[in-house]
């Protein structure tokens, strides 16, 4: 095993261990915390990188998480909601807006959003979501104990297990394609883990990178006829362009295994799904604890999802002529 392999395994294991330790409650079985009797009125800035189902769900979940802790919009919390439309200059303007307005806390949805606001302020608490690895993104010193003004939830998905799912559905697959945004560090991390897992199974990975949504179809077409299936990570550009991607893949009858459930529902075939709404709820609860003075971001471990349930899009399976094995369907959520 080379140094890079060891480093990747340690990194993935470290993130997943943080999830196991930091999120005993993302599954929803825990007791609800009592809402504070009188929460002081606060202003919260919400910056979302781009509009797509997963990030929208994380946004909605955050508001619910805050509400569960006593913060109700229009009563004791005001949200300044901003969408950067995947534009870096927009992100910088939004970050400066929040700093100038002296918001009490910033909720940053997706890595570029969190990185931009973290560069703009080291004083205002920042809670993130839809971020795969905070340490790799240089947002924290350590995922278990951030040591900065940033904390939140991670959307790290079980990449190696996603490959296992792909091979159960397409058992004869020898070459797997992947499409991701070259500038997204979280996507690159997932692809590195995918390549390590594939090497152990003698699976060849063919990559196609994009820089914006306009590159998606060309990237997909470059893989047609060269791969047996696709794996797409939790990548914001790809997620926002799933309908565009599936125009190509459905025509070629190419199955897509996705990094999260909203992408699978939007035209992918299957996933071991990340639930962004629940992650948003947990982020909201963490934010409320910070605002109430119960915790500080520098001491709050990054939290994430522990259990991943298979989701199968039978509508897509029927369209592309893929038979889903009974062992995969058993216990899975089925979209018809």
Language-model regions: role of each:
Residues 2-13:
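Bacterial N-terminal signal peptides that target proteins for export
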Residues 13, 289-336:
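Hinge/cleft segment of the Venus flytrap/periplasmic-binding protein
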Residues 22-25:
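C-terminal motif of bacterial Sec signal peptides marking the signal peptidase cleavage site
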Residues 27-30:
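Bacterial signal peptide processing site
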Residues 41-69, 80-89, 183-187, 237-240, ...:
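Extracytoplasmic "Venus flytrap"
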Residues 44, 62, 151-198, 300-316:
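An alpha-beta-alpha
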Residues 84-141, 232-259:
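Beta-alpha junction/loop-to-helix N-cap segments that form part of ligand/metal-binding clefts
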Residues 134-173, 275-295:
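Hydrophobic alpha-helical segments within soluble ligand-binding/sensing domains
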């Amino acid at each position: 095993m080379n140094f890079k392999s060891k480093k990747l395994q340690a990194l993935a294991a470290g993130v997943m261990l943080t999830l196991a330790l930091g999120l005993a409650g993302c599954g929803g079985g825990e007791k609800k915390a009592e809402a504070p009797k009188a929460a002081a009125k606060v202003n919260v800035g919400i910056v979302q990188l781009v509009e797509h189902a997963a990030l929208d769900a994380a946004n909605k979940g955050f508001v619910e998480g805050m509400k569960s802790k006593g913060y109700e919009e229009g009563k004791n919390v005001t949200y300044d909601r901003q969408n950067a439309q995947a534009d870096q200059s927009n992100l910088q303007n939004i970050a400066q807006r929040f700093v100038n307005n002296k918001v009490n806390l910033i909720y940053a949805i997706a890595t570029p959003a969190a990185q931009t606001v973290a560069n703009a302020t080291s004083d205002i608490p920042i809670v993130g979501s839809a971020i795969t690895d905070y340490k790799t993104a240089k947002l924290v010193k350590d995922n278990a104990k951030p040591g900065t003004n940033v904390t939140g939830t991670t959307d790290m998905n079980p990449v190696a297990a996603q490959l296992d799912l792909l091979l159960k559905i397409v058992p004869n697959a020898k070459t797997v394609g992947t499409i991701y945004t070259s500038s997204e560090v979280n996507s690159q991390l997932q692809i590195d883990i995918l390549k390590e897992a594939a090497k152990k199974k003698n699976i060849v990975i063919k990559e196609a990178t994009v820089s914006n949504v306009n590159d998606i179809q060309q990237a997909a077409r470059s893989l047609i006829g060269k791969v047996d299936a696709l794996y797409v990570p939790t990548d914001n550009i790809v997620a926002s362009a799933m309908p565009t991607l599936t125009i190509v893949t459905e025509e070629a009858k190419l199955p897509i295994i996705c990094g999260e459930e909203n992408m699978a529902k939007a035209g992918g075939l299957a996933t071991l799904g990340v639930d962004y709404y629940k992650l948003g709820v947990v982020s909201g609860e963490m934010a409320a604890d910070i605002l109430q003075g119960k915790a500080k971001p520098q001491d709050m471990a990054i939290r994430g999802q522990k259990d991943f349930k298979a989701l199968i899009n039978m509508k897509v399976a029927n369209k592309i002529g893929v038979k889903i094995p009974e062992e995969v369907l058993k216990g899975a959520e089925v979209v018809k």
